[in-house]
Curated annotation (Swiss-Prot):
HAMAP family, per database record: Ribosomal_uL5_B
Any Gene Ontology biological process: translation
Protein name: Large ribosomal subunit protein uL5
Assigned keywords, A-Z: Ribonucleoprotein, Ribosomal protein, RNA-binding, rRNA-binding, tRNA-binding
Pfam families: Ribosomal_L5 (PF00281), Ribosomal_L5_C (PF00673)
Functional description taken from the UniProt entry: This is one of the proteins that bind and probably mediate the attachment of the 5S RNA into the large ribosomal subunit, where it forms part of the central protuberance. In the 70S ribosome it contacts protein S13 of the 30S subunit (bridge B1b), connecting the 2 subunits; this bridge is implicated in subunit movement. Contacts the P site tRNA; the 5S rRNA and some of its associated proteins might help stabilize positioning of ribosome-bound tRNAs.
GO cellular component: ribonucleoprotein complex; ribosome
Lineage, opening ranks: Bacteria, Pseudomonadati, Bdellovibrionota, Bdellovibrionia, Bdellovibrionales
Cell membrane keyword on record: no
Length: 179
């Protein structure tokens, strides 16, 4: 079991139970899944770029990424339905806890000019969305082999009912929010 998952079960969940005033430990919010996605506009002209992005996301997460395709055609962007556009991976269970631990302890401290995560990323149901501008903040990516820095969107889904519960959970897990 991952060290963050162990800490959640032994320390964080009982503390959140008291803080949020719930009667049962099963009502305490917990992580459900983490989704990483990368969308590339240059993949329309050169679909082979997606293979390098799949390799990078697979190295970061430890799980094979899936190539996503355009749902409908948009002529202004020279886009046809079915063209590969991006990469996505959904993490659950131990890989999710491992990624969350590495995100908090290794990746976010390496972001340039980092002053904390904004509070605007919550969706009203306790889930949090954030974006990273560079994939090189993760130690699994070799800086010399990167042809171009690309960003990614990270969605953290929780079982929280509202944003205050979700924020309390993520702060307890070590997410550095702005004051």
């Amino acid at each position: 079991m991952n060290r963050l998952h162990t800490r959640y079960n032994k320390e964080i969940a009982p503390a959140l139970k008291n803080q949020l005033g719930v009667k049962n430990v099963m009502q305490v919010p917990r992580l459900e899944k983490i989704t990483l996605s990368v969308c590339l506009s240059e993949a329309v002209q050169n679909p082979k770029i997606l293979n390098t992005v799949v390799d990078e996301i697979t190295a970061i997460t430890g799980q094979k990424a899936v190539i996503t395709k355009a749902k409908k055609a948009i002529s202004n962007f020279k886009l046809r339905a079915g063209i590969p556009l991006g990469v996505r991976v959904t993490l659950r269970r131990e890989k999710m806890w491992s990624f969350m631990d590495r995100l908090n302890t290794l990746a976010l401290p390496r972001v340039r000019d980092f002053r904390g995560l904004p509070n605007k990323g919550f969706d009203g149901r306790g889930n949090y969305n954030m974006g990273l501008k560079e994939q090189i903040v993760f130690p699994e990516i070799n800086y010399d082999k990167v042809d171009k820095t690309r960003g990614m969107n990270i969605t953290i889904c929780t079982t929280a009912k509202n944003d205050t519960e979700g924020r309390a959970l993520l702060e307890a897990l070590g997410m550095p929010f702005r004051k």
